[in-house]
A protein has these predicted regions:
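Active-site core of PLP-dependent enzymes with the aminotransferase class I/II
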Residues: 5
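Bacterial carbohydrate/catabolite-sensing allosteric modules
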Residues: 8-234
Length: 234
């Protein structure tokens, strides 16, 4: 089951009917009261990896493009990202106060609102040197806005994204990102579901957290004085 948000507890109806449930890409807020199996990616680690990369490249003024904060996965990506900067004495959330927060609630809205918000961001008197998109949909909106404004990545601004997309590799400056193993998520979920169907609940509730993969590509400008861009390959 793929819940719509953190507070989506409709899975209880299935459980009450005796139907085994495995949640994908989410740990529901009602987990304490209504336990359920979950298969997710290590969202916190993914956010942290991207933050470490930006810091290594000298980026201290970074904007986080949010997408539907009412979700465990998004919250963890942002938390991992923010914590890395916090440990290095930089309060990113305080920097965010310079701009109104943005939250997107649907697929279409995410792309559109990301586009509009990015336009306002680059027109501000003190724009960031890098933007962290916490999902590929918000990145699509940002890329569209950058193209419309004739902004060059990474010469004018740097991008990183949690999630990968085939389009990212075709860009003139391929997007630096963290990817999830969606095939593995599906496989683990099916294996866990079959286990429950056969009556084995010895490890219930189980949270199966899968690793993510970091792809340092060319969308981050090096402000540290070593190189002009990242030189990593996918």
């Amino acid at each position: 089951m793929l819940p719509s948000c953190w507070h989506d507890d409709l899975y209880r109806l299935l459980q009450n009917a005796g139907i085994p449930v495995v949640m994908l890409d989410q740990i529901p807020a009602s987990m304490r009261h209504f336990p359920v199996d979950c298969v997710i990616s290590d969202n916190y680690k993914g956010g942290a990896l991207l933050a470490e990369h930006l810091l290594e490249k000298g980026h201290t003024k970074v904007w986080i493009m949010e997408q539907y904060l009412d979700a465990y996965t998004i919250e963890q990506r942002i938390q991992g990202f923010v914590d890395v900067y916090q440990k290095n004495g930089i309060d990113l959330l305080k920097q965010q106060d310079s701009f109104p927060p943005v939250s997107f609630g649907s697929t279409a809205e995410t792309v559109i609102q990301s586009n509009l918000h990015f336009q306002k961001l680059i027109d501000s008197s003190d724009p960031p040197t890098a933007v962290f998109f916490d999902c590929y949909l918000s990145a699509m909106g940002g890329l569209s806005a950058a193209s419309q404004a004739r902004i060059s990545v990474p010469q004018d601004i740097s991008f990183v994204c949690f999630d990968d997309d085939p389009l990212f590799k075709t860009m003139s400056a391929a997007m630096t990102c963290v990817s999830q193993d969606l095939t593995s998520i599906g496989k683990h979920a099916v294996e866990l579901l079959l286990k429950r169907i056969h009556g084995d609940y010895t490890d219930f509730p189980k949270i199966d957290m899968l690793d993510v993969v970091f792809h340092p590509r060319l969308s981050v400008k090096d402000l540290s004085g070593h190189n002009s861009t990242t030189s990593g390959k996918d």
